[in-house]
């Protein structure tokens, strides 16, 4: 790859390799932006079609994964004229400073910081392409962040795709928040709790008659599940701090007053697996 600079002054890494597929060629770039937490660097990837750009799609990835897992989707979209951009959330991928920071959101004001980071990425690319239609795609936990984004910065979007989104009963969410807060006092925010993991995901496999792994609920394709399990940047256990951020965004987006802030003029597409437990 070759190195350059972007307008923010951050280092840019642009791969010389150009991909071809069923349509146009794609150029893949990587660069870093400062997180709004003032501490971490956001790892950002840009899939750039080498033809006229029809639209821009920003990805908000899910829990315990990272944005480059969407490479096949992003490449496909870029081959069909859509620029794709996305960053690793705090506590994920290259935004984490080490293995101990996976599942931990440093200096975060709950989910607000994650959403502000998403908006910072939006501004970085919007400044270069101000007139091109702009869409936000959020998956699973990333869809929760996308929904909070819509409530705060929705006027910046021409549409949004919410994949595998959901909600939690207020009583259950309140109990989970209380448990996470209590455990944090005793064990510290970096603690990785089996109890919290069971509370959050313990029921997800129960609807399936036979299971191979604890993550079978992720996909009906066994190869997809195995790829996830074999990836050191996937499937790690969240810290108590991470669960508090997750519960924070769920609480925020389920508040009736916040739901009323969703921009009515922004179209939404909801997508989910037929047996998705989320």
Give short role names for the model-derived ranges.
Residues 106-126:
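Alpha/beta-hydrolase active-site loop
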Residues 270-272:
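Short beta-strand/loop motif that positions the catalytic acidic residue
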Residues 61-65, 274:
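Active-site glycine-rich loops that stabilize anionic/oxyanionic intermediates
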Residues 146-233:
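Alpha/beta-hydrolase-fold enzymes
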Residues 74-100:
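Conserved alpha/beta-hydrolase
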Residues 129-140:
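Alpha/beta-hydrolase fold nucleophile elbow
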Residues 25-49:
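N-terminal cap/lid segment of alpha/beta-hydrolase-fold proteins
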Residues 54-62:
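Short beta-strand element of the alpha/beta-hydrolase
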């Amino acid at each position: 790859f070759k190195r350059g600079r972007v307008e923010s002054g951050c280092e840019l890494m642009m791969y010389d390799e150009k991909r071809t597929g069923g349509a146009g060629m794609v150029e893949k770039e990587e660069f870093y932006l400062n997180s709004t937490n003032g501490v971490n660097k956001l790892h950002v990837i840009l899939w750039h079609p080498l033809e006229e750009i029809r639209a821009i799609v920003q990805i908000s990835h899910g829990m315990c994964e990272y944005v480059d897992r969407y490479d096949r989707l992003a490449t496909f979209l870029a081959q069909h004229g859509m620029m794709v951009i996305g960053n690793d959330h705090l506590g994920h991928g290259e935004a984490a400073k080490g293995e101990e920071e996976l599942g931990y959101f440093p200096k975060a004001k709950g989910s607000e910081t994650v959403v502000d980071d998403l908006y910072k990425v939006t501004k970085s690319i919007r400044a270069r392409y101000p007139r091109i239609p702009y869409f936000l795609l959020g998956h699973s936990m990333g869809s929760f962040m996308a929904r909070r984004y819509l409530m705060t910065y929705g006027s910046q979007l021409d549409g949004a795709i919410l994949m595998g989104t959901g909600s939690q009963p207020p009583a259950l969410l309140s109990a989970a928040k209380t448990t996470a807060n209590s455990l944090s006092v005793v064990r510290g925010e970096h603690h990785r709790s089996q109890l919290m993991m069971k509370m959050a995901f313990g029921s997800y496999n129960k609807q399936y008659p036979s299971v191979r792994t604890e993550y079978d609920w992720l996909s009906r394709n066994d190869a997809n599940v195995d790829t996830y399990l074999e990836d050191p940047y996937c499937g790690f256990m969240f810290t108590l701090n991470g669960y508090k951020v997750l519960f924070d965004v769920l609480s925020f987006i389920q508040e009736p007053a916040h739901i009323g802030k969703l921009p009515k003029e922004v179209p939404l597409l909801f997508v989910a697996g037929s047996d998705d437990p989320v």
